[in-house]
């Protein structure tokens, strides 16, 4: 067993997705020396990418000559050094022969539609003397027939290894064993089989040791990847220190785990505090929907959807689109999901009756709702308005209705809404579903959004459109402060959106453009401080 399972550390390459490969020169050297001292079989020192310039603080290099500028003079012990090329990002002209390079091997990652030219590239690298690893990105996207075609190419080129790459952390043990057995059964016996895991389902380490144990009586070499403290893209990888410990304790391998722990303590934990990787809700949602994690990030970052809604949208992803991220595709799915068209004529008739002859005060979530409370209280005492808050129930104010457009905000307010159910009217857009029963008024979402706007479902503007259509003629506004990049924008920090500070000026400009148009049908008056222009 001892000789046919080997380990590869990919901290400096996969971990670099978290910090743009900017580890700092001292950390690069520190990690290198600790991995070598631990006796790990292979060390992946980073990416080869001709689009990048040389930086001694980064583990991403324009060519093989640049790798030697950082690592060339260091003692590598028994550890073999490899770099990685994402096929198409580093031309062969940027790669020296193995005799000229400090690298022993090169790993080539490629998606299935590029398998033929990528394997031809692997052949070129092999002819230059390198130990070559063919890395099957997104293994779960391969059908059995496609994998057999890839195996045909592998048996022709005969790289050092062909690796199962669970790019999105989708594999459970049964699926992993299926791919492993296909490779073990059909790939030339001189070619090693590799496994690169991701931790979306908290299975990276478990799958690795399951595979190691399944492989124990076979003569082929198995190569398992890991990284210090699991440092890697998104959900991260199998922790190399755990793999080394397992191999030491169960199979007599002489890895020095203490060296890895020193590297984690001195070099990796400070990075973890700053960047944080590992199992997360986003990683789980992506893996449970068998999809690219960017789809999840796109939807979650909208800050308008519940996780249930995110899952429902992701369930509509089709075919190869699931793992090949397409921003326009997910935007259209989001739009289609939110559309939920409905006939709201009866709802508007009801609102007209409810609001007939009333002044309306609309409360937003800006900090002035607290800072300028006396002005709001004075207005309520003088005008006795019908009070509507947007997507929240404010502390210290009695409201007559809540306008709901945002599923996430609604879920955060459910208990408060239930507590005030007897006296509170709920006006909701059709993209929301009530937890129990029906909303008092459900309005067509699609008719209220502006798809040309940077923030298409601006609840403030949507509210004003509703009031205009309901025949309201006198509207006071409080807590609509406008957005700023250098201060908190909400009275409660938990309501803050990350994108607001990035897009705040664009949102402000849009509101300034739309308010005069809405002001033609009704009087709009801000009674708290705002960045918006006077109407």
Regions found by a protein language model. Give the residues of each.
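Catalytic cores and adjacent flexible loops of soluble metabolic enzymes
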Residues: 1-345
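Metal-ion/cofactor- or nucleotide/acyl-coenzyme-handling active-site neighborhoods
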Residues: 342-535
